[in-house]
């Protein structure tokens, strides 16, 4: 089941599947994982698959929206309407502001994260094998949400929106006042309040990104361990139950990321 003819031990197999296809931003050459690499690298595979899945989402939902009819809907239109209705209901329950951005943002996050997570159900050797033997790639990882750079980048985008809504709804003065005069409303406690509120604010994107990354990385690692440590004829014994259970994790993590985004933006939009 090895994706490379040079891989001879389970340890090498597991390590190989945890390597990203990286581009050295200083030399613009692919990184050789057998040698030390610099900090300035770009995970090409994570970027490619995340953008590809985002484009697939836009294409499918865009075509369904343009071809939507008021009559009896087809299967795809019914499915899209079900997803949109579910997300819209979640937004209405949790966000009570007037912004028209939240519902489309929540829909994009839910479907996009779900599609990225769904890549974890592909056979672990399929795309890496094709990438190596057809395209000559040294490594390939196909689950963008198992890359901490992707999840923290998405969380950073949410953090920027939190700051934007906080300033827009409360003004700069109100936002600064919230950071310096809560929870203790006295000037002497400004340093303490600033530390407490600052940590609380910064912990939101960090926990948001690391939660998704941790769950998807662990799920991917279990699939790799099953493939790397068991004979090919017995892998299905563990693969099938774990894949069925992992479907729940995939959906749940996409839902949690969406819900926390809505909640954080709702909190930022509250006027005190």
UniProtKB/Swiss-Prot annotation:
Source species, domain of life: Bacteria
Major site of localization recorded for this protein: membrane
GO biological process, one term: proton motive force-driven plasma membrane ATP synthesis
Family annotation (Gene3D superfamilies): ATP synthase, F0 complex, subunit A
Pfam families: ATP-synt_A
PROSITE patterns: ATPASE_A
Intracellular or extracellular location(s): Cell inner membrane
Listed transmembrane segments: 41-61, 101-121, 143-165, 221-241, 243-263
Keywords: ATP synthesis, Cell inner membrane, Cell membrane, CF(0), Hydrogen ion transport, Ion transport, Membrane, Transmembrane, Transmembrane helix, Transport
One MF annotation (Gene Ontology) recorded for this entry: proton-transporting ATP synthase activity, rotational mechanism
Homology family: Belongs to the ATPase A chain family.
Assembly with partners or alone: F-type ATPases have 2 components, CF(1) - the catalytic core - and CF(0) - the membrane proton channel. CF(1) has five subunits: alpha(3), beta(3), gamma(1), delta(1), epsilon(1). CF(0) has three main subunits: a(1), b(2) and c(9-12). The alpha and beta chains form an alternating ring which encloses part of the gamma chain. CF(1) is attached to CF(0) by a central stalk formed by the gamma and epsilon chains, while a peripheral stalk is formed by the delta and b chains.
Protein name in the entry: ATP synthase subunit a
Source organism of the structure: Sodalis glossinidius (strain morsitans)
Biological classification of the source: Bacteria, Pseudomonadati, Pseudomonadota, Gammaproteobacteria, Enterobacterales
